[in-house]
Amino acid sequence: MSKIESQAGELQEKLVAVNRVSKVVKGGRIFSFTALTVVGDGSGRVGFGYGKAREVPAAIQKAMEQARRNMVKVELIEGTLHHHVKGTHAGSTVFMQPASQGTGIIAGGAMRAVLEVAGVHNVLAKTYGSTNPMNVVRATIEALADIKSPEQVAAKRGLRVEEILG
């Protein structure tokens, strides 16, 4: 399903999906390939890219470049999430919650690739609805981007961190 493509500098790159698509023209079909990739630094930055070309390597290259341009910051604490979070894109809904040390990444398919490159080591996650890799990746990154640290929540509410954490 997903494989480690390369280690460019400090970024981890994973290929999530490759599809053959076709365009029907008067003379027949023109085939091309699409690639979905995720890129992360392993410590809280992650992005995804979608590339399309006549050859697989070119599609992967385009996707990797787009993923590097579209990275977002994720708030993590000791390799897990601050709080449970839900993300939705199109027909896909993802739910993630923090897990204790040693749990590992309990997630399937495209969501696992995103969490691995983002630097999340312990998480419980579930996908509901569509399992289309593109929608799952978008929903996962949207959910990760929504995570707020206790410091951010305290600042927004005008309280001290101790009051937020109880």
UniProtKB/Swiss-Prot annotation:
Entries under InterPro entries matching the protein: Ribosomal_Su5_D2-typ_SF, Ribosomal_uS5, Ribosomal_uS5_bac-type, Ribosomal_uS5_C, Ribosomal_uS5_N, Ribosomal_uS5_N_CS, Ribsml_uS5_D2-typ_fold_subgr
Keyword rRNA-binding recorded: yes
GO biological process: translation
Sorted UniProt keywords: Ribonucleoprotein, Ribosomal protein, RNA-binding, rRNA-binding
Residue ranges occupied by any S5 DRBM domain in the UniProt entry: 11-74
Ribosomal protein among keywords: yes
SUPFAM superfamilies attached to this UniProt entry: dsRNA-binding domain-like, Ribosomal protein S5 domain 2-like
GO cellular component: small ribosomal subunit
PROSITE patterns: RIBOSOMAL_S5 (PS00585), S5_DSRBD (PS50881)
GO MF annotation: an example: rRNA binding
Family: Belongs to the universal ribosomal protein uS5 family.
Record's comment describing the protein's domains: The N-terminal domain interacts with the head of the 30S subunit; the C-terminal domain interacts with the body and contacts protein S4. The interaction surface between S4 and S5 is involved in control of translational fidelity.
Assembly and oligomerization: Part of the 30S ribosomal subunit. Contacts proteins S4 and S8.
Stated role: With S4 and S12 plays an important role in translational accuracy.
Protein name: Small ribosomal subunit protein uS5
